[in-house]
Each structure stands twice: as structure tokens, then as C-alpha cells.
Amino acid sequence: KAGVFTTGALGVTGNKKLSFYAVAWKGKSAKLYVRVDNGGSVSPVSVDLRGDDGATGNPPFKTIAWSDETDYFTLELSDLTASSTLTFSTSSTFTAASDSSTGRAVVCGVQIY
């Protein structure tokens, strides 16, 4: 099943950077899509994630081997408004429906600066 998460209003305006760590589920790959709503845009709109043996159905995910080289992403946010929100999904349609072509992901360390 594809996952979808939407933040609250960001409360910042203008152009910013969005950085985070993300991996796909053990033995899988995934594409993580990011969308800006309520004003603004993001580039790129998706990133490819590698599978990590620590990303399983058994949290906490203490055994994920995070890598700055393969798992850390920085995207450009443009023209944000104070009410802009971010939506993260493993579905290009941003729906939480069963879809065998999408993968699961673990996202952490999200920063806007």
C-alpha cells in the first residue's frame, strides 16, 4: 500500500531547501514523490530510494544503515507562502491505495532551511 503524509503549514515564505534522509523497504526499491500545496513548487518532484535491510515491519528502525551519499536528498522549494504544505508519497497520484508498483519508504531528518 502506498503511503501519504502531509505536513502542517510550513510558516515560511520564499525560496528554501528541503533536505531529508529516506530509504525503501528491505529488498525493494521505491520512488518518493514530494508535492507543495497552497503556494509554491518543488524540484525535483521525486527521488529514487534504495532498499535497506533495516527498513522492515518491525520498528524501531535502529538498524537502518543511513548513508549521506545514497540516502540524503536536497530539493529546492520555490515561491512558498506561509500556508504552503508538503506532501510525501510513494504514489505518483498521492493516494493511499493498494498499488503493487509502489514501494514503502522510511523518511526522517526532514529540514527546511
Protein language model features and the residues they cover:
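Short beta-strands within extracellular/lumenal beta-sheet-rich domains
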Residues: 1-17, 28-30, 70-73, 107
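Extracellular hydrophilic low-complexity repeat tracts enriched in serine/threonine
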Residues: 2, 6, 13, 38-41, ...
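Short, exposed beta-strand/loop patches in secreted or surface proteins that constitute
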Residues: 10, 34-36, 77-79
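Short, surface-exposed linear patches
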Residues: 18, 40-43
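Short edge beta-strand/loop segments characteristic of extracellular beta-sandwich folds
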Residues: 19-23
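Terminal, low-complexity interaction segments
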Residues: 27, 42-113
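Short, surface-exposed beta-strand/strand-loop-strand elements in extracellular ectodomains
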Residues: 29-40
